[in-house]
């Protein structure tokens, strides 16, 4: 059995409108079936940077042209066609092409009326903004929306988004429900079993300032013991302040102890009927995260150890993970993200764990051979006014670099770049 993924958004910003969100369902169930048979348990939405607006665009495009389309491929002079960015073993689909043309908003509403469950990796705006805005159009009589995430993520959404100030308190109106997931425990959600893992997405405090800013602090606080001007070499963080827990909500996650911003990965397993002889397929979807090399933690290693057996049994259909930067940059400029070399480093750790688990594997074998690696959260480049001619497609550059490193390291992975607006089967 396979999964069909519709990539509502895969951008890492700063352009809004196509940030990270995917719809996931079994490949053998169509959206027509889900709508006509009222099957909300079949669909998962992982992260919510994009939502109803983007799906409406996708449906309009597919019903009009019968083709897969990504608007970002019009933004750079060196962009290729959609198929260039996906490995040949990944099937590109158009699941909405047979919908009635001219009614994309209606079709979007019908799909969202049959979407119940969201998995939210972390509460940064580029991963949650659409579910906040879309909540004004949710029909609670059709399917009650449930948002699942870590204690820290769910608390942040209640305190800082659905707080009656930034946005109406939708949980109090029963428009959405906020549910905790516990790390490293499996929970049944619809027809899936979901296991959440902790990730590090940078540190809470900004530990580095530009030298001009540091000099300003030094001059304006000459009599104080100012730390900012002394730490140019410390890496920068995902966010710049330590969040306050002032409303009595329980924080159970380890980020409060080690000052690392908590993100999440989700291992999603499709629970097939017991009459089926096939083993249940799984897919691993990451939120934003940094390498263990950067964090000096072992959170990613724990995940690799946990999924190695799935790879050896050919049950893991794909890994969806970020690579925000198209070039190698200093650790203090990563902001809790990956580069191509750091991504390949993490895949090498996964390969090592597979070899450790399978004692029959020799050093010449490739346990990751044929593994689908789908890369998202690519950031659009910010051009210096004097270097406008160097503004090129970052997805193309990342794909080329990853394929080169994949070959050098003899990993054998099938690497693709997720394109907003497209659908694939893995």
UniProtKB/Swiss-Prot annotation:
EC numbers on record: 3.1.4.17
One annotated GO molecular function: 3',5'-cyclic-GMP phosphodiesterase activity
Classification via Pfam families: PDEase_II
Region (Disordered): 210-229
Entry's Gene Ontology BP terms: cAMP catabolic process; negative regulation of glucose mediated signaling pathway
PROSITE patterns linked to this entry: PDEASE_II
Catalytic activity: a nucleoside 3',5'-cyclic phosphate + H2O = a nucleoside 5'-phosphate + H(+)
Entry keyword set: cAMP, Hydrolase
Enzyme class: hydrolase
Family per similarity comment: Belongs to the cyclic nucleotide phosphodiesterase class-II family.
PANTHER family: 3',5'-CYCLIC-NUCLEOTIDE PHOSPHODIESTERASE 1
Annotated protein name in UniProt: 3',5'-cyclic-nucleotide phosphodiesterase
Organism, as annotated: Candida albicans (Yeast)
